A protein has these predicted regions:
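Active-site-proximal alpha-helix that buttresses catalytic centers in soluble enzyme cores
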Residues: 3, 8-74, 78, 101
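Phosphate-handling substructures
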Residues: 29, 71-129, 189-195, 202-212, ...
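Short active-site segment of divalent metal-dependent hydrolases/proteases
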Residues: 13, 152-153
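Generic structural signal for well-ordered alpha-helical scaffold segments
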Residues: 39-46, 125, 129-137, 157
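Short basic (Lys/Arg) and small-residue
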Residues: 149
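Active-site signature of alpha/beta-hydrolase-fold catalytic machinery across serine-
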Residues: 67, 155-159
Length: 216
């Protein structure tokens, strides 16, 4: 049996709503809507026999992870492998300001190129993959929830599904979405990505639907 990993993006924050990039800045917590989103994810995963709940060290991810862990009576394990992307000078800025001040860098990053100060897709994918391998070794044949961030989850899915870096943004990872990856030996399979059926009702999911894959 494989290790089943549920990659969850944290719930929404006021910064997300304002289109402001938090990056790795401390002190950015879930909004009221974000807490409700986290509770919806927790209800969805309550029936899954999770062996561990792992989180990025950032507040918004830890709050989401703690909500998921509560029904399972598990302690959240913080792991730097699932940290947010490093955005350097972009952190704290609104999206419009980033595009105005760094237009060439924004285009380069969108095209999958490496820009000084901004973590590369390859770097994100490598640390996310290493973290996944470690969890698979620690929890063989078990289920684990991992709370992370949009670009790192995109990068991991892109590596598993052989999506080139310049197509990273084609993978949508919304707040409080669930993406399921099964890991068996050296192989990994994406069952589905960006599922939000727990928030929006049947059919509100990404690629493919959990209903199609027989998944939670």
């Amino acid at each position: 049996m494989p290790t089943t990993l549920y990659f969850v993006r944290h719930g929404v924050t006021d910064w997300n709503a304002a289109r402001r990039l938090a990056g790795r800045l401390a002190g950015v917590s879930l909004s009221g809507d974000g807490r409700r989103e986290a509770e919806a994810v927790a209800r969805r995963l309550a029936a899954v026999p999770l062996r561990a709940v792992v989180s990025s060290p950032l507040d918004r991810a830890r709050e989401t992870a703690e909500t998921i862990a509560r029904p399972h009576e598990l302690r959240v394990v913080v792991d730097e492998a699932f940290q947010e992307r490093e955005y350097a000078a972009w952190q704290g800025l609104f999206s419009s300001d980033i595009h105005a001040r760094f237009p060439d860098d924004v285009r380069a990053v969108a095209g999958g190129q490496t820009v000084a100060g901004v973590e590369s897709v390859a770097s994100m994918a490598e640390r996310m993959w290493a973290g996944m391998e470690r969890l698979a070794a620690e929890h063989p044949d078990g289920a684990v929830a991992v709370v992370s961030h949009a670009d790192p989850i995109r990068a991991l899915i892109a590596r598993v599904a052989s999506v080139p870096p310049e197509r990273l943004r084609a993978i949508t990872i919304d707040t409080a979405s669930v993406s399921r990856i099964r890991r068996r030996g050296p192989r990994a399979i994406v069952d589905y990505a960006n599922s939000r059926a727990h928030l929006e009702g049947p059919g509100a999911c990404g690629w493919p639907s959990p209903q199609q894959s027989g998944a939670v």
